[in-house]
UniProtKB/Swiss-Prot annotation:
It holds the Pfam family Ribosomal_L33. Gene3D superfamilies: Ribosomal protein L33. GO terms for molecular function: structural constituent of ribosome. This is Large ribosomal subunit protein bL33. GO terms for cellular component: cytoplasm; ribonucleoprotein complex; ribosome. Keywords: Ribonucleoprotein, Ribosomal protein. Belongs to the bacterial ribosomal protein bL33 family. One of its GO terms (biological process) is translation. InterPro entries: Ribosomal_bL33, Ribosomal_bL33_CS, Ribosomal_bL33_sf, Ribosomal_zn-bd.
Length: 49
C-alpha cells in the first residue's frame, strides 16, 4: 500500500517536498538529503504527516 507523505527540512522546518512510499517496504520514517530553497543548501529532510 502506497501512502502520500510530506518531507520537512530539519533546519528550518519548512515542508518542501511531497512524495509517496510503500509502507510494507519502508515501515520506518523516511529521511533524505534534499535541497531546501529556504536555507539555500542541501539539508536532511524527514517524513512528516
Amino acid at each position: 500500500m502506497r501512502v502520500k507523505l510530506t518531507l520537512a527540512c530539519t533546519e528550518c522546518r519548512q515542508r518542501n517536498y511531497n512524495t509517496m512510499k510503500n509502507k510494507k517496504n519502508d515501515p520506518d520514517r523516511l529521511e533524505m538529503k534534499k535541497y531546501c530553497p529556504f536555507c539555500h543548501k542541501h539539508t536532511l529532510h524527514k517524513e512528516t504527516k
